[in-house]
Amino acid sequence: LFSLCXXXLKR
């Protein structure tokens, strides 16, 4: 999940 987001989750 994190890899796909990349950053999305943090955002």
Swiss-Prot record:
Highest taxon in the source lineage: Eukaryota
Name used for this protein in its record: Unknown protein 2
Organism ancestry: Eukaryota, Viridiplantae, Streptophyta, Embryophyta, Tracheophyta
